[in-house]
């Protein structure tokens, strides 16, 4: 933003002779106090083909500039005819009124200037040598061309006041800011969810009593569920105790069976031993009988007799 704004320029002596000075009434506004002066300058364009013929007619320093609207008259000397090509003395040219601050131009106003002879006879039959005394100028003040430029004013070095960039710290700050934003969003979402759960009356008032009743019911329901859970847990504990008692009873009943089984095994072994003894006695008797048979059987000699 420009601190100085050009509000208007008024050309005072127009038309005028070529040799008359230029006079401008300039009005501008200053928004902030300035440390330096404003430099106003008027330039005459001597030739459209080259910048070598441009002439700086005059310059003026205005200051100190107070804050607010300011007005002054800028007077500049006419151009030197000797520095202008003869073929362009009587023609259309341009003058430039510019303003700079601290060597930096921020506004420029251009005007077309028509230079011609003051008599119809000279206009129809121009002399071979230009007669400067008979040349008049007419500035087209109604059609100025204004150009503005952005410059740095007195706050040019404000950037040095700020601390230097610290990449690591800056990244941490950004991360913290992002976390804070996320937390805020989550809190907003939770708040919205809570608002949706609350019932609103027709008039837009919240039915707090119903909410309390609901809360009590919910609490009672939770306590009832807790009681049911406690009963179930107690039943399960009773069942576990019964299962343990049944297991102990089965163990006790199984013990006599084990004893009976051992006794049966001993009886069976005793019977088996008795059977084996009986078998062995039978075998002994058979062997004895077999040994006695030769004594009773007749001999071959007896059979022949």
From Swiss-Prot:
The entry's keywords: Chaperone, Chromatin regulator, Coiled coil, Nucleus, Transcription, Transcription regulation
Cystine bridges: none
Ranges in coiled-coil conformation: 168-206
InterPro entries referenced in this protein's UniProt entry, alphabetically: ASF1-like, ASF1-like_sf, Hist_deposition_Asf1
Signal sequence residues: none
Bias (Acidic residues) ranges: 168-213, 221-249
Gene Ontology molecular function, alphabetical: acetyltransferase activator activity; histone binding
Superkingdom, taxonomy of origin: Eukaryota
GO CC terms in record: chromosome, telomeric region; cytosol; H3 histone acetyltransferase complex; nucleus
Region (Disordered): 157-305
Family of the protein in this entry: Belongs to the ASF1 family.
Name this polypeptide is given: Histone chaperone ASF1
Organism: Candida glabrata (strain ATCC 2001 / BCRC 20586 / JCM 3761 / NBRC 0622 / NRRL Y-65 / CBS 138)
